Amino acid sequence: MLGRLRTVVKASSSNSIRNYLGYTSGVQKKTVTVIPGDGIGPEITSSVMGVFQAAKVPIEWEIFDISGGQPISQELIASITRNKVALKGPLYTEILSGSQSRNMELRKALDLYAHVVPCKQIPGITARHDDVLVDFVVIRENTQGEYSGLEQVLTPGVVQSLKIITKEASERIARYAFEYAKANGRKKVTAVHKANIQKQTDGLFLATCTQIAKEYPEIKFENTIIDNCCMQLVKSPEQYDVMVTPNLYGNIVSNIGAALVGGPGLAGGANVGEGSIIFEMGAHHVAADIAGKDKANPTGLLLASVMMLKHLGLNEHATKVENAVKAVIKEGTLTSDIGGKSSTKQFTGAVIDYIEKNQN
């Protein structure tokens, strides 16, 4: 069922770009840049494409076959800028190499300042807290903090890393968090920080969030120290609604959130900028150990693709895909990471079958 996509040949200066045409109808097609990425990326991206074909989503895919070991090309940046929307698999970052993370490179090049990760339990999956509803959203400042990439060796054996926090970036992410809460019927925003120790950097972030909170009196505002936040997430995650964080803390908290709802394969996410948005899994795990073995869980990227469809105004298609994914999980078709025995293709096939049986 995954082989039903029709290839469209277009002139290109790079053989790393492929174009696929999804379902064709009277509806104007939308073009989306796709980066399958490394590890399990190509498998879960293929899953999304197969599901979209079955759901008759009017999308044309512009695919860039790049790896985390390759530089980000200007052609890729131009594609995302032109299309304004991209779907991305995980990109591998070598731990001890001197090269910059390609994920960071994309965020900086496109000014993707907000990383949004909804963490919500899915019926049919055994989670860490079955007695309470886990349903919170992590909104992470995506361009500064410890991820500024400003590191240097001062002398052999001594290195320095600069943490950059600005009022402008803090205002932007805080306002985004409150606007997100307002638009999505959320009641509370919690700022996560370490201002008790990092009094200047995190102090500025917290002070700015506190200032912006005054513009939204209808939304409750709290703040919490990052170490206590991690403990409380494990202990009582139901107390959180929307969390706004500096860069590093958001990475940590969103991974905890993914674990709380069942694992890294279950959370979708988006990197949001003023001009472009990249949708991807909420937890960026390449999972090289299972790559190519038909064991990957495509749920996280499927849920990210649902977010993408809603952003594009394709709400009926979004509902169709989301309902199918949740129905298949509830019926017990699960991949091995969440206690099942289904392969990637079997899970994807079950989602496609559900869509085709319930097609209007």
UniProtKB/Swiss-Prot annotation:
Family: Belongs to the isocitrate and isopropylmalate dehydrogenases family.
Enzyme class at the top of the EC tree: oxidoreductase
Cofactor: binding details: Binds 1 Mg(2+) or Mn(2+) ion per subunit.
Disulfide bonds: none
Protein name: Isocitrate dehydrogenase [NAD] regulatory subunit B, mitochondrial
A Gene Ontology biological process term: tricarboxylic acid cycle
Cofactor(s), by name: Mg(2+); Mn(2+)
Catalytic activity: D-threo-isocitrate + NAD(+) = 2-oxoglutarate + CO2 + NADH
InterPro entries per UniProt: IsoCit/isopropylmalate_DH_CS, Isocitrate_DH_NAD, IsoPropMal-DH-like_dom
UniProt GO MF annotations: isocitrate dehydrogenase (NAD+) activity; magnesium ion binding; NAD binding
NCBIfam families: mito_nad_idh
Chain positions recorded as NADP(+) binding sites: 284-290, 297
